[in-house]
């Protein structure tokens, strides 16, 4: 494995609804042989519990991540994950000298968007995203709020102008809308596309109507 491949992607999960998007993105990165640095906000842990019934604990993060992915705890793919607590401002991703390749915030709340856009850094997720921007590394913000206020739209524009990719959690139904997981994978796959990571999460449009659906 090259030194470039060993550089991790930071995955930040904020408190927005959309835990399955984060799970699919993490699984896609690990299946691609990538290393992952995981940051879960305090609000995200509440959302994860509400949406999945799984209590994500700092002290048992590997067990809980395996449960979210529906993998065995012993799965060696999990060895590529490093977990950082949301309040750890001494963590690797808080520094520009840390060799992260980039970051995806999935899903992103309006509050996270606001904090990142003004460099608030109220927790490690926001700090890591701000560092990613200042170091000119890829930052993908998968915003999952509706409707969007004028203030949030302005903040998203600021992030876009600073170099971030703004990726609304808007699935393409041509990928096969009869399956919720297919719609989840579509959004996660678009996030990985924005990072430049190869994956097989989504069926790509080929110009042939019905081809993606027929692939099921």
Positions of PLM-derived features:
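A cross-family phosphate/adenosyl-ligand binding-site feature
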Residues: 1-139, 147-216
